Structures are given as structure tokens and as C-alpha cells.
């Protein structure tokens, strides 16, 4: 039985929208950048991208490349900005030793901002995701442990978890969640194996965190693959994808022998992140189940642009019976 989406879809051209805004939270004016093609359909997905320590929303927008992925796949992007500490550095409150007296609740800020954007721009309340780099990856982990219903899946890059931080439910999350971890073996800012003595404060190793979420999601199988070294620089990325027939949740780990950065140059990590998020797109539009013989005519993305059959991208499949099938993953149509 296949699910058939009844949908009229029209998108003649793209106009891009990028603006900076303030959001009042707990008495603080918080900054963020909102980016989207202005002709996004109602109920489009929303992706948050959080900057690293000392970074900014503007810098993360330039660094991540996520706007281009949004243009190609039809989703909105929010680049939130942390608060500024007494040394003048922007940060997310994840429990660094030198922020021990800070009371800013960034978990609640991001959840509140996401809910506001969903309402204000008619974005999907079911399809909101978050990724982040370094300190931004750390706030992703905190949100994952929080088990919020606001964010559907999480993709921390080069981040970690500080057990002495601001969360009380470490290793006791409210619910299992899908998570995609990217980290370099030669990361000298957030060591892959964790560290007890860096000035950040004690933090956990990547394998400890990944194994926790694998167990939490009751995942029993995995696939391992190695990306080709396209530029012959010796930097290799290995993917390990954990899954199970008993749940839709997956846990991915992309490990590479590079340092503290957004990813290995052989892959487009922002596209990989969106591919992961696309697995968890929930379609709230009315569907009808039918079995039909059909031939594929064309494939469109969320913006109505004709699209190649890209792995794990949320697409609409038009068949000769004049109906559209939706899938977050082309494997549903194999």
C-alpha cells in the first residue's frame, strides 16, 4: 500500500528573503537571522544552525553553506545567536567551567524561538530540526537530552557534552531521538575521546555519546562506509549508520581524520545533514492509500523544481496516473 498525496503545487520562480531580528526571551533581546525563499509553501520544514563559541549568527550562515541547501530543497533556516559573556564572547550556555554563574536558559530560548517562527511564518511544527558547530553542537546535545517535542532530529558537529553543565537529565532523556554526530579524530578543541582536564570542564567522548543514543533507540544493526578521498589530501570520512527494523530512528556517526571544523572537504556535510533530517519529515497533508500500476514521469522538490532522485531528499514523485507520492527517502519508491 502506498500513500498518495493530493496536492496542487506551483512555484514559478524563487525570491530570497534574509533578515535579522530580535526576540525577547527572559528579559533579554536575543538576535537571530531568518532565511528562506519567500515562496515556500505553507508547512515547510525549518532548520536551526547554531554557531560555535565566539561565533555569530552571520558567521555561521556564511560558514555552514546551509542557505544553498535550503534553496535546493525548500526549507527555512534560522541562525540564532548566543548571549555575550563577560569577556565579550558569544556562547551557548552548556556548562563551561568559566560560565559557572551564568543562568541563561538557551534550551528554552531555542525552543521558544522555534515555536514563534513556526507560528509567524506558517512553518511546520512537526518538521523542525537543529544542527550546530562546536559550542553550537553542544547545545544540540542538550536539546536532544531535553527530549523536546519542538525539534524532531539533531545533528551536532564537533561538539560534546559536559556532565557538570546545566542539564539535570544527562543519560536520562525524556525520549529516544534520532541524532547524527560528526567529529574529527584530530580535533584539538573538543577531543574525540573526551577530556577531564581542559579548561572547558570535563566532557564526554564521541563514542560514549553515540553508543548511548544507539542503546536508547534500541538499534541493533549498522552499516559502515568510507567516502572516497576525492582531493587526495589523506583526510578520510567514515560513516557508521545504526538502525533497526523496530524503529524509524537512526543514529549516524561521521568520523574523519581532520580537525575542529564543519566537516571533511570530500563531502558536503550540510547536504548530509539535510539528508538525515529528511528521513524524519512528517507529512500532515491528507493522504489516501491505494495500490496502482504507474510510471514515473518526474520528480520535484519542495519548491516545485524538477529534481534528480537524490538520496534521502524529501521529494514529490509524479506518476502517469496524475497523482503525487511523497517520500523523505527514494528507497520508499524502489
What are these regions (language model features)?
Residues 16-46, 58-64, 72, 102, ...:
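A domain-start/cap signature at the N-terminus of enzymes
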Residues 38, 94-134:
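Gly/Ser-rich "nucleophile elbow"/oxyanion-hole loop immediately N-terminal to the catalytic nucleophile
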Residues 52-55:
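Active-site glycine-rich loops that stabilize anionic/oxyanionic intermediates
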Residues 58-107:
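Active-site machinery of serine-nucleophile hydrolases
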Residues 159-221, 231, 242-245:
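The feature captures the conserved acid-bearing segment of alpha/beta-hydrolase catalytic domains
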Residues 179-182, 216-283:
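C-terminal catalytic histidine-bearing segment of alpha/beta-hydrolase fold enzymes
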Residues 279-306:
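Residue-level detector of functionally pivotal "anchor" positions at catalytic/ligand-binding pockets or at interdomain
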Residues 325-332:
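Conserved small/polar residues in nucleotide/adenosyl-binding loops
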